[in-house]
Design a protein with these regions (language model features):
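Conserved class I S-adenosyl-L-methionine
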Residues: 64-72
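Conserved SAM-binding motif I beta-strand of class I
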Residues: 86-91
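Conserved SAM/SAH-binding beta-strand->alpha-helix loop
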Residues: 93-95
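Conserved SAM-binding strand-loop segment of SAM-dependent methyltransferases
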Residues: 107-118
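Conserved beta-strand signature within the Rossmann-like core of class I S-adenosyl-L-methionine
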Residues: 153-164
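Core SAM-dependent methyltransferase catalytic element
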Residues: 196-211
Length: 211
C-alpha cells in the first residue's frame, strides 16, 4: 500500500512538472505569435528613429560590441551600427528581426540577430561593451547586466515607470517603481539618469558603467 501511494505521488509530481513546462512553453509561444503578428506590417510599429535619450548620449558609450535586448524592429540597434558599433540583437520575434535587417540595409550597415526567448536566456559574463534594453521589462534579466559587461562597459535602459499608469491601461508589473533603475544598478557608476513625464507618457532612463 505504501509503495502504491509513493507511485501515485511520483506520478502526480511528474504530471505537475509536465503541466508546468507545457504551460510555460505555450505562454512563450503565444508571446512569439503575438509579436510576430504585431510586426507583420510594412509600417514600423515604433518608428524607424532611435530613442532621443540614446542619440543625445551616444558619445558617452564605449565603442565595441553592443547587445540589443528585445531589439524588435531594430530602430536603436541599427542607429548604433551607423555610429560604428558592432551590434547583435536578440528578440522573440523573427518577424521583427527580419525588419531590423531591412532597416540596416537601408542605412548601409550590417547587424547580427538571433531569435531568443529572453525569459529563459542567460547572458555570458564579461562579453559586451554596451547592453541596450528599451521598453522591455524583465527584472531578473536586468540583474545579469553588470556581470555580462566588460570592465568599463555601459548599460542603456529606458522603459515606462509607475507614472505611466496615469495615462494608459498598463499592467503594474511592467512599470518601474520610483528610482527602481537606480536601485537595480546601484553597484554601477550612474552616468546619466532621467525621469520623464510629458503629461501623455512617463518613463525612466539610465546609463550606468561597470567599474
Amino acid at each position: 500500500m505504501k509503495s502504491f501511494r509513493n507511485h501515485k505521488r511520483i506520478a502526480l509530481f511528474t504530471a505537475l512538472l509536465i503541466l508546468g513546462f507545457s504551460t510555460t512553453v505555450f505562454a512563450h509561444s503565444r508571446d512569439k505569435d503575438r509579436w510576430d503578428n504585431k510586426y507583420d506590417t510594412e509600417v514600423y510599429l515604433f518608428g524607424e528613429n532611435p530613442i532621443p535619450f540614446l542619440v543625445k548620449n551616444v558619445h558617452l558609450l564605449p565603442k565595441g560590441k553592443v547587445l540589443d535586448l528585445a531589439m524588435g524592429e531594430g530602430r536603436n540597434g541599427v542607429y548604433l551600427a551607423t555610429q560604428g558599433f558592432d551590434v547583435i540583437g536578440l528578440d522573440i520575434s523573427a518577424t521583427g528581426l527580419k525588419k531590423s535587417h531591412k532597416l540596416a540595409e537601408r542605412n548601409n550597415v550590417t547587424i547580427e540577430t538571433q531569435v531568443v526567448d529572453l525569459e529563459s536566456f542567460t547572458l555570458a559574463p564579461n562579453t559586451y561593451d554596451v547592453i541596450l534594453c528599451t521598453y522591455y521589462m524583465q527584472r531578473d534579466l536586468f540583474k545579469q547586466f553588470q556581470s555580462a559587461l566588460k570592465p568599463g562597459g555601459m548599460i542603456v535602459v529606458e522603459t515606462y515607470n509607475i507614472d505611466y499608469l496615469k495615462y494608459a491601461r498598463f499592467s503594474r508589473k511592467w512599470a518601474l517603481d520610483t528610482n527602481e533603475l537606480l536601485d537595480i544598478f546601484k553597484g554601477m557608476r550612474v552616468i546619466r539618469y532621467q525621469d520623464y513625464d510629458n503629461g501623455k507618457e512617463a518613463y525612466s532612463s539610465i546609463i550606468a558603467q561597470k567599474p
